[in-house]
Amino acid sequence: MIEGAQAGRLPVTVLSGFLGAGKTTLLNAILRNRQGLRVAVIVNDMSEVNLDAESVQRDVSLHRGRDELIEMSNGCICCTLRADLLEQISDLARQQRFDYLLIESTGISEPMPVAETFAFLDTEGFSLSELARLDTLVTVVDGSQFQALLESTDTVARADTEAHTSTRHLADLLIEQVEYANVILVNKRDLIDEPGYQAVHAILAGLNPSARIMPMAHGNVALSSLLDTHLFDLPSLAASPGWMRKMEATDTPASESDTYGVTSWVYRERAPFHPQRLLEFLQKPWHNGRLLRSKGYFWLASRHLEIGLLAQSGKQFQWDYVGRWWNFIEPSQWPRDEYRLQGIMAKWDSVVGDCRQELVFIGQGLDTRVLQRELDHCLLSAQEIAAGPLAWQALPAATAFDTEALSARPTPPMAVQPT
């Protein structure tokens, strides 16, 4: 018997992955080999006709008395249907008829918002975690296409209807699906030779060092790897991306590389970036190995009060602003709890406070010395720093980083060139 069901909370596994990765094949395989478990399934598809749900229904047609299929169409689990998802899971959990719940997410959603649904408190203080236990986040990737898709310039519709734009880059979606997973299944292993599989494995491990990465073909994978694993933990998941783990690590070298040449490197400096020189860096063709992922915080001279968040996946750099540096906030407005205060002071500098450049780069064949020189060139010179914030506002290309350009595609686009 599944432990969560015995304890009164319905255990849940969420299946994510891009369209065609093999989520439905995996779901069908689980339902065919569920070892007598009474399973409820929530399927989400963006189309009018939910073909994925129909295929699952055929597989469980002999067990309709014990299995329940719920279709959630015309929306996305991670955003527009969050309220519906809460209601559906709550209803299933209260029935106490099922041992397990499987959720197949749409191909254009990422796992983290689904996970946050379980921690969400409604207006009456109710949390879904009182009735259901999120057990495992599983991401399925097409091993035969994953590297090519990372290089794609294609865009997909955004699941997040409140975002700045209605589309996002495919590479960005794929990486987020990988970064926020407990288990990553490399599907179509039978179509990949051993060096190809190891190369994909190395990339995935660089993007998410804490995930369990396993090969899969035709949905065949041990049920114990997906159900009742107890791998999910929200704080740990939030810190699972490789870029974040590298940024927070204090006992590892600035640059690390494994046998397949996947390097993670952190750029740290305490001077602001010049907007024009930074923009030139972001727009120029990339010739320094193969850049897989970069993300982190930046300090821009023309917006010196604000914390910049720079993110790259595939061939696209994007930026946003996520609040003010604590250096420009009155101490009376600082957090009171010791844990958060320690976090602020851990990044504190006696001259510029917490203002900083802290960018993580993950890639293959990266020459970090070249990257260091290029980024150093983007910093303000001593003379420019001495001119002060008023002069910084008038620096060339300052408007390129205004709010209107938060999701703008740099022109010409960044060109990631594989080694």
Swiss-Prot record:
Q: Which reaction does it catalyse?
A: GTP + H2O = GDP + phosphate + H(+)
Which UniProt keyword terms apply here? ATP-binding, Chaperone, Hydrolase, Nucleotide-binding
The name under which this protein is listed is Zinc chaperone P47K
Membrane-spanning residues: none
CDD domains listed in its UniProt record: CobW-like
Species: Pseudomonas chlororaphis
Classification of source organism = Bacteria, Pseudomonadati, Pseudomonadota, Gammaproteobacteria, Pseudomonadales
Q: What class of enzyme is it?
A: hydrolase
Q: Which Gene Ontology terms cover its molecular function? A: ATP binding; hydrolase activity
Q: Which SUPFAM superfamilies match?
A: P-loop containing nucleoside triphosphate hydrolases (SSF52540)
For the CobW C-terminal domain, which residue ranges apply?
262-379
Stated EC number for the protein is 3.6.5.-
The record's section on Pfam families has:
cobW, CobW_C
